């Protein structure tokens, strides 16, 4: 999963044994597992905070050895919307960068750098490719964070690299220090170099991204509105709908749309969800998300199955939650498929 690899590189490019990071708790399951368990074995600990926490609660999570703050623009699958300005303010007050996973929103709907983020990651396997045809990821550095100003905290960037002819990245590369270290050190030693074929397919996807994203968003809103009016549906979560918990944040950060993913639950709970998904014909049950074809998934038993009940709730994943990734098909066809699947 490239989203996990990107997050790993983004953090470990500046963190080492004995360090600490602060993360919003609403995360993709694999990313949560990476921060809660895997990098902990490497000596880097994470403190998870509720995305809706107060500024006081957020600041209390920082430690002397904190190296970064991490969050997702739109959490998968909780769809919690990240409050950039709140987290950026706290990160910069503690002299650390804000790193944001912008996979779901894409740069079409949200530009995190404009709201205080310093580094942005993407699983390009999702909307950027858009056709589930290639695997890839990206780390984008704004060049805005002044690593040299806090040299003792980020010594990997401000002191000589013995593995690279004694280069001091901040002196040699200036604003490009972070991304140069990531490619010349981490990628050199750990790999993750995209193949030419994957790069070619990704480039094709990027050429139509600006056309596809509005359709994804439009289909998501229309499907959410349909589900809201169905007698068998207990709840619907679509951040772009008025009345949603994070609607004000959407209007602030993503007024033109969020993404093509919505979530909902049925009154019959988990059993009803499984039954309904099995009856779908056009919409497939797929672990993948965010491409041209519509698909559904039950995250609690798939993408987030490694998490316990408490961790699931903290990540915003209810036991009955169905994740619905709307593609770019005709919305009337998609609604008709859902309608027949909900029939007794």
Which residues are covered by each model-predicted region?
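Flexible loop/turn segments at secondary-structure boundaries
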Residues: 8, 108, 129, 244-246, ...
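Conserved PLP-enzyme active-site core in the AAT-like
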Residues: 5-229, 237
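PLP-dependent enzyme catalytic core of the Aspartate aminotransferase-like
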Residues: 18, 29, 36-37, 45-46, ...
């Amino acid at each position: 999963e490239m989203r996990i690899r990107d997050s790993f590189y983004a953090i470990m490019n500046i963190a080492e044994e004995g360090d600490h990071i602060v993360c919003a708790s609403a995360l993709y399951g694999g990313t949560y597992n990476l921060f809660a368990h895997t990098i902990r074995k490497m000596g880097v600990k994470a403190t998870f905070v509720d995305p809706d926490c107060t500024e006081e609660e957020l600041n209390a999570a920082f430690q002397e050895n904190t190296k970064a703050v991490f969050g997702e623009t739109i959490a998968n699958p909780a769809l919690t919307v990240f409050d950039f300005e709140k987290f950026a303010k706290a990160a910069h007050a503690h002299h650390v960068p804000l790193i944001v996973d912008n996979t779901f929103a894409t740069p079409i709907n949200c530009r995190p750098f404009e709201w205080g983020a310093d580094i942005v990651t993407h699983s390009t396997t999702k909307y950027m490719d858009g056709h589930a045809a290639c695997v890839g990821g990206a780390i984008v550095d704004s060049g805005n964070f002044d690593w040299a100003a806090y040299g003792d905290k980020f010594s990997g960037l401000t002191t000589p690299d013995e593995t690279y002819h004694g280069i001091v990245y901040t002196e040699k590369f200036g604003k490009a220090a972070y991304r140069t270290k990531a490619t010349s050190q981490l990628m050199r030693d750990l790999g993750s170099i995209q193949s030419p074929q994957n790069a070619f397919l990704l480039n094709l996807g990027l050429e139509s991204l600006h056309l596809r994203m509005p359709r994804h968003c439009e289909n998501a809103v229309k499907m959410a509105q349909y589900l809201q009016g169905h007698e068998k549906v207990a709840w619907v979560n679509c951040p772009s709908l008025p009345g949603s918990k994070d609607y004000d944040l959407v209007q602030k950060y993503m007024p033109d749309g969020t993404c093509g993913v919505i979530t909902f639950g049925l009154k019959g709970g988990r059993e009803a969800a499984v039954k309904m998904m099995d009856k779908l014909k056009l919409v497939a049950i797929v672990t993948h998300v965010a491409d041209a074809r519509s698909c559904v998934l039950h995250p609690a038993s798939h993408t987030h199955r490694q998490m316990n009940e408490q961790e699931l709730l903290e990540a915003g994943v209810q036991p009955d939650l169905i994740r619905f990734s709307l593609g770019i098909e005709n919305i009337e066809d998609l609604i008709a498929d859902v309608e027949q699947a909900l029939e007794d």
